[in-house]
Amino acid sequence: MAFLKLRDQPSLVQAIFNGDPDEVRALIFKKEDVNFQDNEKRTPLHAAAYLGDAEIIELLILSGARVNAKDSKWLTPLHRAVASCSEEAVQILLKHSADVNARDKNWQTPLHIAAANKAVKCAESLVPLLSNVNVSDRAGRTALHHAAFSGHGEMVKLLLSRGANINAFDKKDRRAIHWAAYMGHIEVVKLLVSHGAEVTCKDKKSYTPLHAAASSGMISVVKYLLDLGVDMNEPNAYGNTPLHVACYNGQDVVVNELIDCGANVNQKNEKGFTPLHFAAASTHGALCLELLVGNGADVNMKSKDGKTPLHMTALHGRFSRSQTIIQSGAVIDCEDKNGNTPLHIAARYGHELLINTLITSGADTAKRGIHGMFPLHLAALSGFSDCCRKLLSSGFDIDTPDDFGRTCLHAAAAGGNLECLNLLLNTGADFNKKDKFGRSPLHYAAANCNYQCLFALVGSGASVNDLDERGCTPLHYAATSDTDGKCLEYLLRNDANPGIRDKQGYNAVHYSAAYGHRLCLQLIASETPLDVLMETSGTDMLSDSDNRATISPLHLAAYHGHHQALEVLVQSLLDLDVRNSSGRTPLDLAAFKGHVECVDVLINQGASILVKDYVLKRTPIHAAATNGHSECLRLLIGNAEPQNAVDIQDGNGQTPLMLSVLNGHTDCVYSLLNKGANVDAKDKWGRTALHRGAVTGHEECVDALLQHGAKCLLRDSRGRTPIHLSAACGHIGVLGALLQSATSVDANPAVVDNHGYTALHWACYNGHETCVELLLEQDVFQKIDGNAFSPLHCAVINDNEGAAEMLIDSLGASIVNATDSKGRTPLHAAAFTDHVECLQLLLSQNAQVNSADSTGKTPLMMAAENGQTNTVEMLVSSASADLTLQDKSKNTALHLACGKGHETSALLILEKITDRNLINATNAALQTPLHVAARNGLTMVVQELLGKGASVLAVDENGYTPALACAPNKDVADCLALILATMMPVSSSSPLTSLTFNAINRYTNTSKTVSFEALPIMRNEASSYCSFNNIGGEQEYLYTDVDELNDSDSETY
């Protein structure tokens, strides 16, 4: 809120504050602006309402002042008058149609303001004009909430008498009684209870009114609620009872009352903390703790993380409370889940008095805690020298390591407190002792840039060139973390060797470069020229081995964007085109990451721009284009020689323009085109940048290419144009732009690819309805061209009913009976894939249900052979397909269903057959459906066939009955025939005897190598729909040599 000086305000405002109506009238007569607004948008009427001056208010309104003007906080004059409890001013404003429902920025109405300010008379004037007294503000609070919070009993009575909802809750589910209890307004609480308020209600966190009163120490409310019988041990959402809350807030009077009433002093919350834990930790919990301990609280109870109340006193430094707990029988060396005792905790947080108390009480200073550390480890690590001194005085071996081999001196060196370090050194700590990682205290001091500790350790004789398990010296760590170079400089002055390489082949120069520490690099370079250092370090003169890393400091600085470090490196390192294991140069990495300053530094020093890596054969220009770093790209192109560098190709023939379009980097696309990039350049698959834009759908890139003359009908190695690809991928915006471009040059967009497919085929196959609609608007697509496997075939085979419907609507119903090169109609395709909705659509357009393809198969046969039960049911029931038709091998639909073992389909067909001749119809191999069903073990079908009069004596071309057809091979069938002949003593003239011996006599050869198999006519034909069509195999177009667009045409189905 802005406080303005009255003397700086207009005369009218000054007159209002002076309370002089005559002067106000005179100023208005002189045309003073009655609607003037200050910088808080307050008007003179706001001022008069604030002062409650009814006469001036009316005078201003009659002179044209806006009665509902809002200031910057959306407060109206009525809000101001109510806040000032001026009944007369409110009456005048209401008389002049002030808005009683006006809301400020907190959504508070004048009634909210009245309730909060005890303006009972004002509220009485407002309430009759309101339709609802339960309107809530932004926090969800009603006027009753505000009245209860402010303790205004008369206002509460008024609101309740006018229909206020006593149990209304705000956005935290708190009711009026919560706020009254929290503020200690006992009379309001009683009033609310007498009107039916729930005393056990809970907010969103399950706090009850008792929790609220206990937290703020309102003892009178607490006693009243307890007298009403509320549960004093009721937990909130965190498991805290009112006793927990009172202890946490140090409300000892409430704690005493709750304990006297029988509250459970040992009840745990969700984390296992008791009230005693809270009392031990809280700022004002000392008296609470005394009360709890005196009333039987368990001083050794542990939380879920193993902490006792003594741990809590140690954590927060509650010295006197720790003494009380210890005197009450607390276990001194109890451990939490990390193994830390209270002494560890006190040492970690530097509570010296607590440490003294704990040691005096017998705490074990040599007890191990987290990671096997002593309390002295933690005190040294945190830099508390007085605590270290106390712990040392208890006496134990200071060189004893923790679980990782680190001594207290390691901890002090890492913590950086010189006093702690010197204390340990003077006590005899071993400064060369190494941990399990091979690191000495000097390694830790260097890694944490603790110059004073490093100085003291080196001065004590610590070895500066000791290697850890990774082969790193303290200098490596200093190079990593030392921004101002002090530690590194001191190590160099004390004979640290900057040429030592770790096990990965990195020396201090690498680490300084990786972290961008320019000063460190300058210091190292001042000792030894970097080129000499890089050449000589890492080699073994005796073994002729070389452990130098393939990544140079130049690579590291360039990759991480440390251009200042790079400037130092390029002054000394001559080979700027050094390559890593994949052949990438520092310039390549800088361009790839978009570090313009690094690119600039390297180019200015003569780094090669057109050098290619080993893997993808890409240059830095490709790297910048791939990731969309336009500034780097401009720098590289502008400094590249020759000029055709803009079209340089990688190993797959891709240009920077192609890569920019592929990744949607419009800025880079324009930069390359403006530099003369060949817009129609092709890669090794014959694809241009426009092909990539069509696949990825980057419309802005496509527009840029078309503006620069890109040809939209160029074909790739599979004959596909960008129009094909955009239609296949469903990018309607790109497709529209390409069609418009084709039209503008009088080109035919309905070209076909190598398999005869047009863009319409592809759009239909993938179900991109918006693309189908757009293509059908073009005149050239109003007739079916290309592969006989038509767009309608493509749509129905993938269940794209919407696309199919569009095609029929646009091209006419005659297309539903179009056939492909094998004579199959769209109905065959729908039947093959069991797409019932498409099947219904085709049948509704008079598709010929009994049309046969080149092998004589009808859609029903196709569905039966492939077990498409939904299609079979529709065709035999709704479409009345002809069940008597036979294919070229004389198989009926029933033969085909049985031959492939599709029992449900066979039963559906059988349900519609009543003609015994059809039941016993034979195919070219003289097999009846019973032969085929029995051979495939279709029990229910066999049973149904027999029930419908199927002949059990019918013989096929091998002379076998259906029973013999069940045999797995010829020999078994012959044996079975012999057994049957023996079992049935009939005359030689019996048909069965003749049949059986005919079957036996057909095979006089006893060779067991001849097996009984299904006849060729029942085998899977080469023309079956094993793979109906693979036109849509291409879901993504990634431009690599192993991810080509899939071959597909109707020959594969």
From Swiss-Prot:
Gene Ontology CC terms, in alphabetical order: nucleoplasm
Keyword Repeat carried by entry: yes
PTM annotation: Ubiquitinated by the ECS(RAB40C) complex leading to its degradation and decreased PP6 activity.
InterPro entries named in the record: Ankyrin_rpt, Ankyrin_rpt-contain_sf
Transmembrane segments: none
Cross-referenced PROSITE patterns: ANK_REP_REGION (PS50297), ANK_REPEAT (PS50088)
Segments annotated as ANK repeats: 40-69, 73-102, 106-135, 139-168, 172-201, 205-234, 238-267, 271-301, 305-334, 338-367, 371-400, 404-433, 437-466, 470-500, 504-534, 549-578, 582-611, 616-645, 652-681, 685-714, 718-747, 755-786, 788-817, 822-851, 855-885, 889-918, 925-954
Keyword set, alphabetical order: ANK repeat, Cell projection, Cytoplasm, Nucleus, Phosphoprotein, Repeat, Ubl conjugation
Cellular compartment(s): Nucleus, Nucleoplasm; Cytoplasm, Cytosol; Cell projection, Lamellipodium
Keyword Cytoplasm found: yes
Major subcellular location class: nucleus
Xref: SUPFAM superfamilies: Ankyrin repeat
Entry-annotated residues carrying Phosphoserine: S1007, S1011
Tissue expression remark: Widely expressed (at protein level).
Cross-referenced Pfam families: Ank (PF00023), Ank_2 (PF12796), Ank_4 (PF13637)
Function summary: Putative regulatory subunit of protein phosphatase 6 (PP6) that may be involved in the recognition of phosphoprotein substrates. Involved in the PP6-mediated dephosphorylation of NFKBIE opposing its degradation in response to TNF-alpha. Selectively inhibits the phosphatase activity of PPP1C. Targets PPP1C to modulate HNRPK phosphorylation. Involved in the PP6-mediated dephosphorylation of MOB1 and induced focal adhesion assembly during cell migration.
Complex formation: Protein phosphatase 6 (PP6) holoenzyme is proposed to be a heterotrimeric complex formed by the catalytic subunit, a SAPS domain-containing subunit (PP6R) and an ankyrin repeat-domain containing regulatory subunit (ARS). Interacts with PPP1C and HNRPK. Interacts with PPP6C, PPP6R1 and PPP6R3.
UniProt name for this protein: Serine/threonine-protein phosphatase 6 regulatory ankyrin repeat subunit A
The species this protein was found in: Mus musculus (Mouse)
